[in-house]
């Protein structure tokens, strides 16, 4: 997706700061066939499922950046009255070591939702390298 391509380009070019307003959420939408419980209660409603999976997508993007040594936050950058898609992912490269809890949470989320984020494919070498040196 365009957002994942932009994030991967920034990471691969050692960007110190990354700011993206994510679009292109459909990749995980197609992967989620059945939500882990108790989330199935929400995902049985099409619109709610779409919005929830959008949030899962952006949360996984943020977590991948965190695993690669970025301090990350997700903020609203335009009021909700203008658009429902008003999230910005902000990341600053710190190189800080990652806590094992962060890795565990990412792995559990991917496993529970049975998804493979496109960004993780694009950055698989860097994620593996971070794991090999003990950063993950």
Identify the meaning behind each predicted range.
Residues 1-136:
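Class I S-adenosyl-L-methionine
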């Amino acid at each position: 997706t365009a957002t994942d391509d932009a994030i991967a380009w920034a990471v691969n070019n050692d960007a110190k700061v990354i700011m993206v307003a994510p679009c292109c959420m459909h990749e995980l939408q197609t992967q989620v066939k059945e939500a882990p419980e108790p989330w199935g209660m929400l995902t049985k409603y099409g619109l709610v499922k779409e919005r929830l999976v959008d949030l899962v997508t952006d949360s996984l993007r943020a977590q991948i950046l965190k695993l690669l040594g970025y301090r990350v936050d997700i903020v609203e950058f335009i009021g909700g009255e203008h658009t429902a898609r008003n999230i910005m992912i902000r990341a600053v490269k710190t190189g800080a070591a990652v806590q094992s809890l962060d890795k565990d949470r990412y792995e559990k989320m991917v496993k529970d939702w049975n998804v493979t984020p496109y960004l993780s494919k694009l950055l698989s070498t860097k994620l593996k390298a971070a794991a090999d040196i003990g950063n993950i």
